[in-house]
Curated annotation (Swiss-Prot):
Keyword list, A-Z: DNA-directed RNA polymerase, Nucleotidyltransferase, Transcription, Transferase
Organism of provenance: Acidithiobacillus ferrooxidans (strain ATCC 23270 / DSM 14882 / CIP 104768 / NCIMB 8455)
Catalytic reaction list: RNA(n) + a ribonucleoside 5'-triphosphate = RNA(n+1) + diphosphate
Subunit structure: The RNAP catalytic core consists of 2 alpha, 1 beta, 1 beta' and 1 omega subunit. When a sigma factor is associated with the core the holoenzyme is formed, which can initiate transcription.
InterPro entries tied to this protein: DNA-dir_RNA_pol_omega (IPR003716), Pol_omega/Rpo6/RPB6 (IPR006110), RPB6/omega-like_sf (IPR036161)
Lineage: Bacteria, Pseudomonadati, Pseudomonadota, Acidithiobacillia, Acidithiobacillales
The family this protein is said to belong to: Belongs to the RNA polymerase subunit omega family.
GO biological process, one term: DNA-templated transcription
EC main group: transferase
Residue span of region Disordered: 66-91
A Pfam family that the UniProt record links to this protein: RNA_pol_Rpb6
Gene Ontology MF terms: DNA binding; DNA-directed RNA polymerase activity
Protein name as catalogued: DNA-directed RNA polymerase subunit omega
Record Gene3D superfamilies: 3.90.940.10
Amino acid sequence: MARVTVEDCLEHVDNRFELTLVAARRARQLASGAAPEVEPGRDKNTVIALREVAAGKVSRAILDEQMPPPLPNFPGAANREATGAEDAAGE
């Protein structure tokens, strides 16, 4: 898939707001070391996440999963743990 469109992704999620949440959560997982479900090529995590949604490999169910703690060498991990900050989804 050369280019991902919102329409491709909306076949697998209910609306564009949910698409934003699903893609953001998946991009965070990829940044934390999760294995991509599609060929990553030279794409950034956000594009890979959208390609996974468009391919039907990632769905709304990802929002129900607990996010693992960030890797120690992940940027901002020390700040997040020190402040007890929650992720953007409010979990």
